[in-house]
Amino acid sequence: MRKLSGAAKRWIGTSETKNNVEFSNPEFKDYIKQGGHTPGAPYCASFAKSCALESAETPTERKVIQQVLTPHSLTSLANAKKAGLYSSTPTPNSIAVFQKGTTQSGHMAVVDSVNPDGTISTIEGNIGAGGGRE
C-alpha cells in the first residue's frame, strides 16, 4: 500500500458539519461508507479502511483489507494480529491503532511519516475540534 498516505491526504481539510453524519465535502460520506461507516458512528477506522482499499495494488491485497479492517479499531487490530500483519514498529503508509487505556475504545490513523525522534505524523478521520481522538 505504497499510496496509502496519498489516498488519505486528499481528504485533509474535510470537516464534519453534523456529528459523524454530514461533512463539508459531500463525497466524503460515500467514501467512508466503502469502509463500513454507518451515519452517526465514529469513522476513524472506516476512513483508514477506505484509504487502504483505494491504495490496494492487487485484488489479493484488497481482499485481505476487506477481511482484516473493520469499522472498529480494536477489532481490526485483533484481526491484523491473527493474520500475522501486526507490527509494533510504525512505517509510512501503514495504519496505526491506538487503544484508550484498557478499554474497548480505540482510534485508527494512517501513518504519513516516522519522525527522527520516533514520533509519527498521521492523517486521521474523526478527531475532535481540539485535536482529541473520538
Regions found by a protein language model. Give the residues of each.
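N-terminal capping segments
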Residues: 1-58
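...with weaker cross-activation on analogous glycine-rich loops/strands in unrelated enzymes
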Residues: 58-132
